[in-house]
């Protein structure tokens, strides 16, 4: 075979390369992370936790505040991190660029050589009472990040109860009390091409309406369409919840935004529908499902973080204590395939 026939033409090479790159980023976006909460007694040391992430091939972590021990343990681990700015810091960081610069210097820049920061999440499920501080705090953190020469996206995490009129999902919109401060945030995220983080819990939808929501719809085990929406069909509650937020974004000028599911999971005891078996079913089905997107965003993997690594016995009410994939002794509560 001649050389001219044995080698692909430059246009073909470019096409093949673009397909490989697209496949890589789609796979990367679909990798599963796990949230590392610390509100529990007798939890393992941060170094042991990071070792457990690596042992289980968990490549992404969410950390709810700048814990020095955890950040130090993450050095050199190659685990990508969502680092939260606690909501209690919003007013201080919104009122002072100097304070925001200091926060980024101490908690991000100091670890830049060894920790892979993926997102800085400013505020978790911010309530309307402090929502007026959110945009300015995000802008000040963004200024500090860019001023330090860091390439880290800045976002915020919302709960799905910020939306209403969610059935069918295409009717979803933001509640008025959230819309007033979220719409400027949505505009900011769009201008920076940053995703919106969403804590998405089919369990809570099921828990609040067991008379009308069947367990199989929440666990990804329904055998047929449950919710028909013009142009879309829903066989699981996760997709319906997610797409209702996408619909709300479209109504608020954020149709270009991607959503990162920054929390989701299923408790093993403490309330209706909780069991080890249900949690195992939900989590393992979730991991497979998010590879393929949702009806409103088909074919694009959904970056997703499972809540949580461990049970946290300092939380209330009772069902909030039992979301962990692992016991404090690092033994798995049930089998999960992270691959």
Swiss-Prot record:
SUPFAM superfamilies: (Trans)glycosidases (SSF51445). It comes from the Eukaryota. Transmembrane segments: none annotated. Its EC number is 3.2.1.39. Pfam families: Glyco_hydro_17. GO terms for molecular function: cellulase activity; glucan endo-1,3-beta-D-glucosidase activity; glucan exo-1,3-beta-glucosidase activity. Gene3D superfamilies: Glycosidases. Residues 1-30 form the signal peptide. This is Glucan endo-1,3-beta-glucosidase, acidic isoform. It comes from Arabidopsis thaliana. The lineage of its organism: Eukaryota, Viridiplantae, Streptophyta, Embryophyta, Tracheophyta.
């Amino acid at each position: 075979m001649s050389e001219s026939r044995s080698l692909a033409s430059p246009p073909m090479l470019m096409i093949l390369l673009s397909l490989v790159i697209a496949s890589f980023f789609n796979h990367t976006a679909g990798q599963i992370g796990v949230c590392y909460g610390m509100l529990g007694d007798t939890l393992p040391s941060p170094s042991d936790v990071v070792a457990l992430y690596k042992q289980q091939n968990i490549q992404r972590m969410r950390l709810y505040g700048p814990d020095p021990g955890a950040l130090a343990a993450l050095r050199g681990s190659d685990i990508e991190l969502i680092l939260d700015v606690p909501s209690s810091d919003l007013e201080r960081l919104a009122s002072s660029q100097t304070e925001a610069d200091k926060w980024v210097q101490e908690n991000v820049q100091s670890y830049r050589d060894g920790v892979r920061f993926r997102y800085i999440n400013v505020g978790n499920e911010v309530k309307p009472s402090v929502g007026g501080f959110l945009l300015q705090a995000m802008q000040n953190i963004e200024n500090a990040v860019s001023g330090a020469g860091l390439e880290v996206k800045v976002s915020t995490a919302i709960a799905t109860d910020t939306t209403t009129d969610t059935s069918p999902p295409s009717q979803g919109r933001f509640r008025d009390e959230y819309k007033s401060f979220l719409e400027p945030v949505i505009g900011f995220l769009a201008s920076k091409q940053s995703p919106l983080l969403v804590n998405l819990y089919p369990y809570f939808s099921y828990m609040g309406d067991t008379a009308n929501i069947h367990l199989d719809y929440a666990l990804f085990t329904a055998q047929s369409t449950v919710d028909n929406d013009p142009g879309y069909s829903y066989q699981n509650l996760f997709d319906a919840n997610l797409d209702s937020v996408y619909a709300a974004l479209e109504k608020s000028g954020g149709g270009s935004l991607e959503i990162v599911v920054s929390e989701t999971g299923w408790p093993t005891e403490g309330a209706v529908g909780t069991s080890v078996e249900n949690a195992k079913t939900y989590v393992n089905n979730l991991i497979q499902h998010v590879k393929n997107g949702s009806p409103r965003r088909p074919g694009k993997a959904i970056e997703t973080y499972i809540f949580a690594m461990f049970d946290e016995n300092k939380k209330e009410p009772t069902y909030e204590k039992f979301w962990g994939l692992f016991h404090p002794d690092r033994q798995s509560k049930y089998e999960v395939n992270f691959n």
